[in-house]
Amino acid sequence: MRPDIHPEYRQVLFHDLTANTYFLVGSTLKTDRTKLWEDGNTYPYVTLDVSSASHPFYTGKQKQVSKEGQVARFGQRFGQFFNKGKAQS
């Protein structure tokens, strides 16, 4: 391998601001910010808006969108085209 072409791989401290959770993960992400971690070492520090700790899909708090309203609205708009050949009751 050629020297000096690969990014530096190191431990980086990620902070999910929404869930107030910290992750210490190996990464090549560059940052000037640092923070002292629980183990007494100082690591590069990156803030996140969303991670697996706060995203609704991973936390199980994802809301299902009701399709009933969309189907009714479709029927109101285009139902006349489907009912042309049928007898009215």
Curated annotation (Swiss-Prot):
Kindly give the Pfam families that the UniProt entry links to this protein.
Ribosomal_L31
The record, for NCBIfam families, names:
L31 (TIGR00105), PRK01678.1 (NF002462)
SUPFAM superfamilies per UniProt: L28p-like
Under Gene3D superfamilies, the record lists:
Ribosomal protein L31
Q: Under the cellular component aspect of Gene Ontology, which terms does the record hold?
A: ribonucleoprotein complex; ribosome
Q: Which organism is it from?
A: Aeromonas hydrophila subsp. hydrophila (strain ATCC 7966 / DSM 30187 / BCRC 13018 / CCUG 14551 / JCM 1027 / KCTC 2358 / NCIMB 9240 / NCTC 8049)
User: Which UniProt keywords are listed?
Assistant: Ribonucleoprotein, Ribosomal protein
GO biological process, alphabetically ordered: translation
Q: Which HAMAP family match?
A: Ribosomal_bL31_2
Determine if Ribosomal protein is one of this entry's keywords. yes
Question: Source gene?
Answer: rpmE2
| Record protein name field | Large ribosomal subunit protein bL31B
Q: Which GO terms describe its molecular function?
A: structural constituent of ribosome
Q: Which family does it belong to?
A: Belongs to the bacterial ribosomal protein bL31 family. Type B subfamily.
Q: Which domain of life is it from?
A: Bacteria
